[in-house]
Structure formats: structure tokens, C-alpha cells
Amino acid sequence: RRVLFRSYYNVYPRGTFTELARFHAGKALYLDTPEPRLDQSGTYSAIQQLQMFMEYFPQSSKKEEAQNMIFALQDKLVMKEYLSAKLYYNMGNYLGNNYQACVITAQNALKDYPYTNLREDLSILILRAKYELAVYSVEDKRAERYREAVDECYAFKNEFPESKYMKEVDRIFKEAQKMLGEGSEEQ
């Protein structure tokens, strides 16, 4: 279907139904996007098509629906990043340092999609991975990495004071402080 819509607005760029054709071409791509575990190139195409529709027709009655589809597609991309970061975390030290890959993947997802509803889950993955990175570090880097884990605990507590992960954060904080020899310090 999307080919028919695309051919219509390419052949009749000023046609009566060009607005609808552009919208439905984007919607067809939206409906055709795969689940987050799979390759997301179709999701990027759908976002691009819907953004082009909104640029060409900023006053369209379909603009809000197109914007909502873009948000849903971005959520799918965030979920893909979250699943990748979680996979790296679960792989741990298998065949290299996957904890660092987890941190980088999750931080990039937070940078690219700052308003995601998975922000808390990505942040706890970063904290867990930084802590595990400290635990399995060589002696020279261990103290620095424990400090990074403590800093991440503070950042997490500030951003998510009512988090469902707070007990785990407190446990990591106490263990990291203990390893740094700062256990008597107040939280």
C-alpha cells in the first residue's frame, strides 16, 4: 500500500489527496515496523516519512496523530536500546568487558531520548553496570570505579527519589562506600 501512496504524491505533488497520501504512506510504514528485538531500519523510515508529512503539511488535521505515531516509534527505538544494554549487562565479563558496553549503550539512549518512559530502567542499568565494573576491576582502577558507582547512586537518588529500585541502590551505595573505606559517611 505504501508504494501506491508514495507514487500518488510523487506523480501528483499538488494533487487533491497528496496530504492524505503522504500521511497514509507514513502510517503504512508505522504499521509495518517490527518488534523492538529486530532490526529497526523500518522504524527509522517510518519516523522520517511521518516527519516529512508534518513538514509539508504543518496545519494538517492529521498532524497530532502523526506526532503520536512518531512518539510510539521512538519508544520502540528506546526499548531496542534498553534490550541491548540489558543484554550487555547480562553477559557481564563473558568475552570481554560488557559492563562498559552496557553503560555506553544506556547513556546514549538517555542522551538520544531524554524524555523516555524507560529513563529509570536505563539509569538503574547504568548504576548496576558501573558497580559490577568496579567489583571486577584491576586494583589500579578499582577505587576510581567505586567512586563512579557512588556518584551514580547520588544521581539516581536525586532523579528518582521514589524509585522501586531504592533498596538496591542503597545496598550498592553501602557496599561501594565500604570498599572505599567511607562506610561511616552519611548518605
Residue ranges with predicted function:
Residues 43, 94, 99, 143-146:
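TPR-repeat structural position
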Residues 39-48, 79-81, 145-148:
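Structural signature of tandem alpha-helical TPR/SEL1-like repeats
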Residues 77-126:
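Alpha-helical adaptor scaffolds
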Residues 9-20, 36-40, 51-68, 72-76, ...:
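Short solvent-exposed coil/turn linkers within tandem alpha-helical repeat scaffolds
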Residues 3-4:
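Short, small-residue-biased leader/transition segments that mark boundaries at the very start
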